[in-house]
Regions:
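Asp-based, Mg2+/Mn2+-dependent phosphohydrolase catalytic module
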Residues: 37-38, 42, 62, 66-69, ...
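N-terminal helical cap/lid subdomain that shapes the substrate entry/recognition surface
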Residues: 1-59, 63, 70, 84
């Protein structure tokens, strides 16, 4: 059981992350032992579809991603998410190809704000932290995590920022929810 494994194993991560697929697999196989891995995956995707009210990009997201790429910037996604839920949403919104690489926490065993999650990206791509900036909408997982590895950050308060999220101490703060400001800096 993935949940029991994660809670019982001493982990090197301060913010461990489970992969929900083994949980879906256990539930599905209990009722249908012959279910295929593909069917388990599809069941996980369907749970997300059924329980999600809306999937859309923030205004100016595509413009910012395109603008950064045109400016020669590398763009990476570091997401606290389950791949089974998130990948189809990234594809549906048409932004997968806008990233140079995508790191999803369920694949890595840890999540933001764990510095190790950031280090996996930094080390894989040999990034110079002084040349990087984390853009996020959560003062704890996004901004504090970036600061923990010495990375500058840009905070955008959005409709899904944690309620009463304090304005973080970081290089840039945009409280109007418009990620488009990124292109102005």
């Amino acid at each position: 059981n993935e949940v029991n494994r994660l809670t019982s194993v001493k982990t090197k991560y301060t913010s461990p992350e489970i992969d929900i697929i083994p949980v879906f697999e256990a539930i599905c196989r209990k009722h249908r032992p012959d279910i295929t891995d593909e069917e388990v995956w599809k069941a996980g995707e369907q749970v997300r579809v059924i329980t999600t009210k809306m999937i859309k990009l923030y205004p100016n997201t595509k413009k910012v991603l395109t603008g950064l790429k045109k400016a020669g910037k590398k763009v990476y996604l570091l997401s606290n998410a389950q791949r089974v839920f998130t990948w189809q949403e990234l594809v549906k919104t048409g932004i997968v190809d806008d990233f140079d690489d995508i790191f999803i926490s369920s694949d890595e065993g840890c999540k933001k704000p764990d510095p190790e999650f950031y280090k996996k990206l930094i080390n894989k791509h040999n990034l110079d932290i002084a040349e990087c900036i984390m853009i996020g909408n959560d003062s704890t997982s996004d901004i504090a995590g970036a600061k923990a590895v010495g990375m500058d950050a840009l905070y955008v308060r959005t409709a899904i920022s944690p309620e009463n999220d304090p304005v973080p101490d970081c290089k840039y703060v945009f409280e109007d929810g418009d990620i488009g400001h990124v292109l102005d800096i």
